[in-house]
Amino acid sequence: MINKDKLKGFISGLLFTAVLGVSALGITVLAEPMENKISVVYDNIKIYVNGVLSQPKGANGETIEPFISNGVTYVPVAAISKIFGKDVSWDGNTKSIYIGKKPDIKAQEVTVSNVEELFAALGSNKHIKLKPGIYNLSDLKQGYSERKNIYWKEEFDGNELILDEIYNLTLEGLGDKPAEIVVEPRYADVFTFINCNKISLKNIKAGHTIEKGECAGGVLNFNSSKDIDISSSILYGCGTYGIIAMNTENLKFNNSIIEECTNGAMTMSDCKDFTFTNSIFRKCESSNLINIYSSSNIVYDKCEISENEAFIKDTNILAVSLSSGIKFTNCKFKDNKTFNFDKNIIPDIDFTGTTFDGNSFDGSLDFGK
């Protein structure tokens, strides 16, 4: 048990570093607070966590040392986060340090009718409602952005929009049909989310403007993100994949469609706790339709996988490796063509209640019927 009295210096250090905006946090802090000159003593103070020496690092890998000022020992927040086993983050907009889960903050509602308004509204704690229409991100001015969390990355034939460390953002299309968000560069993803949390897309259609078969970018790309909710939406090709995910957790995909993508429906690596429910993955021309690598607890329930076609010999409709907890329950595989489907190389997948009809699979297909 941690002695609360011993934590007083920790918490004092937390508040101290927040006010002064110094790098003892072990995270990047961008702030313009008031300045106070103080005397500090560095005395090679060591931090042990559960008997193990801990050396908190800064954003550039440098060691962050505790120090003493006026008899109080100030300790990096990174050390506190390690003690409690919680992530630590800094929000420059609210000038807040978060250890573990961030508090729920009511999102600001904004209604937009064109792509300029959409771009201006993007950010944390926003619920953006899109009026019916097409929002072409490539129509935006794409120069230098002073917003460090929203910026453009140059690709081979244009720019790609990056949302970095965005929290609690909802994009919701208004009307009976989804609001459509598109990009023109074939090497750009429509949206790339990096280190984002609590992202929601509702009634959104997203894809590329150019002809099918010409893309090298995907639709939605999630990197080191969590708590993603996609519902009543359509992700379409020519994008390479509808969903690209790496080191991402807790993604929910409900009542939605991925269609006509050129490399497959989705690819994921080092991910966990994904749930696809009441959704359709169809008409993709694929190398491997669904790629799952080094991931766990990926569940498809009441989904339809239909009319997909392999364009390379020895292509697998499911490419699963170094993964566990993969389930296709109550799903339908139908009218898929020329894929390999050998249950012997994917023996740990649960196909309870799943049916197969009208497929032309190569390889062994024996589900104990």
Predicted regions and their residues:
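Short aromatic/basic micro-patch
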Residues: 74, 111, 200
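Surface-exposed or flexible loop/turn and strand-edge residues in extracellular/cell-surface modules
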Residues: 35, 42-44, 94, 107, ...
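Short glycine/acidic-rich loop motifs that flank beta-strands on beta-rich extracellular proteins
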Residues: 139-140, 182-190, 209-218, 239-246, ...
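Right-handed parallel beta-helix
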Residues: 168, 172-177, 197-208, 226-237, ...
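Right-handed parallel beta-helix/beta-solenoid
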Residues: 102-120, 134-135
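Extracellular beta-strand-rich solenoid/capping regions of secreted or surface-exposed proteins
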Residues: 120-124, 136-172, 181-203, 207-226, ...
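Primary recognition of N-terminal secretory signal peptides and signal-anchoring hydrophobic helices
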Residues: 2-106
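Extracellular beta-strand solenoid repeats
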Residues: 129, 136, 162, 170-172, ...
